[in-house]
Amino acid sequence: MAGGSKTRIHASLVSTLLLLLPLASAIHRSDFPASFLFGTATSSYQIEGAYLEGNKSLSNWDVFTHLPGNIKDGSNGDIADDHYHRYEEDVELMNSLGVNAYRFSISWSRILPKGRFGGVNPAGIDFYNKLIDSILLKGIQPFVTLTHYDIPQELEDRYGAWLNAEIQSDFGHFADVCFGAFGDRVKYWTTFNEPNVAVRHGYMLGTYPPSRCSPPFGHCARGGDSHAEPYVAAHNVILSHATAIEIYKRKYQSKQRGMIGMVLYSTWYEPLRDVPEDRLATERALAFETPWFLDPLVYGDYPPEMRQILGGRLPSFSPEDRRKLRYKLDFIGVNHYTTLYARDCMFSDCPQGQETQHALAAVTGESNGLPIGTPTAMPTFYVVPDGIEKMVKYFMRRYNNLPMFITENGYAQGGDSYTDAEDWIDDEDRIEYLEGYLTKLAKVIRDGADVRGYFAWSVVDNFEWLFGYTLRFGLYYIDYRTQERSPKLSALWYKEFLQNLHENQ
């Protein structure tokens, strides 16, 4: 009874909100190429749940979230959105939106519970086969990420995961298994999602697993060296990517005819002050974020901006490493949410905190007490649509207009378990965000950027890492007491946008 009553209430609310949708929009589906991919994105740990079902082993995030104090609301992804059991329902949600692509990640722990030290798990292969076949039946292209933060805890316990070159062989084996099992139907692969975030938070700040850091970045019980370990971990990520991409290009690409890339978190930076020092600081802040990983993959070495500051702290690439790096990625995945200010800490006095120790630049979202854009519920996430245009143009210049996909872009709502469903569902701010960013994206494509797709984060509310369930990015609201899905106003807007229903006649 209660569930049916909620359904009627939500349906009534959505019907009312539908009347509030603007009659005309500044952006239309027809402003993008006909072949353009429009989709939604998720990740395995954030939505699947079923953390011990189907012979899956523990991941690093399974362990991390069960340690008290790590997650804001004390929650975890044990159940999350229960996508493991409800994937068919979620595929129907995507189909109802009218998207032609779905970006998701594979749980390494489901496929290889013990890494290369054990066998392939048939139940894991079966789950992703069913998911891939289900979305293809709806005319939706799978866009698959191999690793989105979560790895088997076995590899951390056995040899220290990303701090050990052994992981390159493990990741290569995992990639090989996935290419062989799913590559006949998957035409878009990415090796990693936001390794720049995972490395920074895991080995510099200590706020993500494996929780390693040192002062002034933090005081981690597990120890660590924030001045060295992030660069070792990043080096092993880069060479793991190179291992996987060599396997794909030598063994699979010619017959499977797919593309492969890497997804990076990409903040745009503006100088805090109109002075040369801050303009240089923005260049350093940019280089220490995304080119940290992309420059080696495109040009074979770390950015000169990093070499100048870090010197010998950056590992070197051996002749064998450079041989593998000759196999180039086919596209860049750009996760863009926000724009921040950067202030010089190389030639100027600067507060000595953790943020100044990496690129000798302090970053902030405010200037003289004024935010750079409209704040959102996610700290440091501001609404600055110009940022996506400038970010794409930066990649155009630096990487000779290598093909790009906007693999994540979305708006954070904040609340808690007492927030009414109606407050989540009425998300006009998200519509304004999507409309603004898509307008700027269409403009930069008209200016010549080779951007081939856009994925809204996310199709459904989900577990938002350190923030648990206190932040929601979904186009669909989830009542976690019942797992009921309800469309937010933004889902209706996105659907109508994809159908060109906003276009003035």
Curated annotation (Swiss-Prot):
Keyword check for Isomerase: no
Record keywords, A-Z: Disulfide bond, Glycoprotein, Glycosidase, Hydrolase, Signal
EC assignment: 3.2.1.21
One MF annotation (Gene Ontology) recorded for this entry: beta-galactosidase activity
pH dependency: Optimum pH is 5.0 with para-nitrophenyl beta-D-glucopyranoside (pNPGlc) as substrate.
First-tier enzyme category under EC: hydrolase
Entry comment describing in which tissues the protein is expressed: Expressed in roots, leaves, flowers and pollen.
Catalytic activity: Hydrolysis of terminal, non-reducing beta-D-glucosyl residues with release of beta-D-glucose
Record InterPro entries: Glyco_hydro_1 (IPR001360), Glyco_hydro_1_N_CS (IPR033132), Glycoside_hydrolase_SF (IPR017853)
Residues making up the signal peptide according to the UniProt record: 1-26
Catalytic site: E194 (proton donor), E408 (nucleophile)
SUPFAM superfamilies: (Trans)glycosidases (SSF51445)
Xref: PROSITE patterns: GLYCOSYL_HYDROL_F1_2
Descriptive protein name: Beta-glucosidase 18
